[in-house]
Regions:
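Domain-level signature for soluble enzymes in the chorismate/prephenate branch of the shikimate pathway
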Residues: 1-298
Length: 301
């Protein structure tokens, strides 16, 4: 005889049962995470770091190695990142500085690393991100350090030299630039707002489609979207999420010149991270001679 025919109500009932089990397991995990905090406090270390990036990296690698599908590894990692973020928030609310305002790629990187339970603190500049971490106003900071098209981010490199902070992790984020505007056609555009790195990553597209528009560098792509929202003849280069935040339409999608455009972000902290088993060492080196063309920065990772 053939296989029994599944009925929709039976499948939904089974889903409800699985959801109930998931909820019970999530509660059990949260209680275990709380126990970890209690053990650390019992050891007499009131300043214990509840967030351990090396431990989180180990957990995510293990989960992905066990994943048999049908969810892909990226989806599974995202789910468990959010679970860990929510559990951590029960013990130690996390404040994370990033280059703001809302709607930047730095914000996206922060969410990918720390999840939605963390309190994200927007900063006006990369230098301010470093100052916030150094002063202890936030637990961690996120800063872009290198782009596959434009190379190193000089503001981050300079700040790494100026501050005694540790790199505790990294996030590689695929960068897709959208052209956002109140204008209805490219012919109406007179100004293009964007971070200097983003303007460079879209240089050839802008040359071909907006050759006469003024290119205006701004502190972040989120700030560019905010400025474009106040004008009728301006566009901003920004991520898709900024279109929703600032109520702009997408005039053109994925305008980056390189299809595999990727930016590497670093997680900044005041304490060294432990070994995770898949670690990198980063160095920033500057020569004593400061003449143009003589400054040298090298990183090995």
């Amino acid at each position: 005889s053939g296989q029994p025919v599944l009925r929709l109500e039976d499948v939904r009932r089974h889903i409800d049962q699985v959801d109930q089990k998931l909820l019970a397991l999530l509660s059990e995990r949260a209680n275990l995470a709380h126990s970890v905090g209690e053990i650390k406090r019992a050891e007499g270390n009131e300043d214990a770091q509840f967030y351990r990036p090396e431990r989180e990296a180990q957990v995510l690698r293990r989960i992905q190695s066990l994943n048999a599908g049908p969810l892909d590894d990226a989806s599974v990692a995202w789910l468990f990142r959010e679970i860990m973020s929510a559990c951590l928030a029960l013990e130690q609310p996390m404040r994370v500085a990033y280059l703001g305002p809302a709607g930047t790629f730095s914000q996206m990187a922060a969410l990918r690393q720390f999840g939605h339970a963390a309190e994200l603190v927007p900063c006006l500049s990369i230098a301010e991100v470093f100052r916030m971490v150094t002063s202890g106003s936030v637990s961690y900071g996120i800063a872009p350090v290198e782009n596959s098209t434009e190379g190193g981010v000089s503001q981050t490199q300079e700040a790494l030299l100026a501050h005694d902070l540790s790199i505790c992790g990294e996030i590689a984020l695929r960068i897709h630039h959208q052209l956002l505007s109140n204008a209805s056609a490219l012919g109406e555009v007179r100004r293009v707002y964007g971070h200097a790195q983003s303007l460079g990553q879209c240089r050839h597209w802008l040359d071909a489609h907006l050759p006469h528009a003024e290119r205006v560098p701004v502190s972040s792509n989120g700030e560019g979207a905010r400025l474009a929202a106040e004008a009728e003849d301006a566009v901003a280069i920004a991520p898709e999420v900024a279109a929703q935040l600032y109520q702009l339409q997408i005039l053109a999608a994925n305008i980056e010149d390189e299809a595999h455009n990727t930016t590497r972000f670093v997680v900044l902290g005041s304490q060294d991270a432990g070994a995770s088993g898949a670690d990198k060492t980063s160095l920033v080196v500057r020569s004593e001679e400061r003449r143009v063309g003589k400054e040298c920065r090298s990183r090995w990772a």
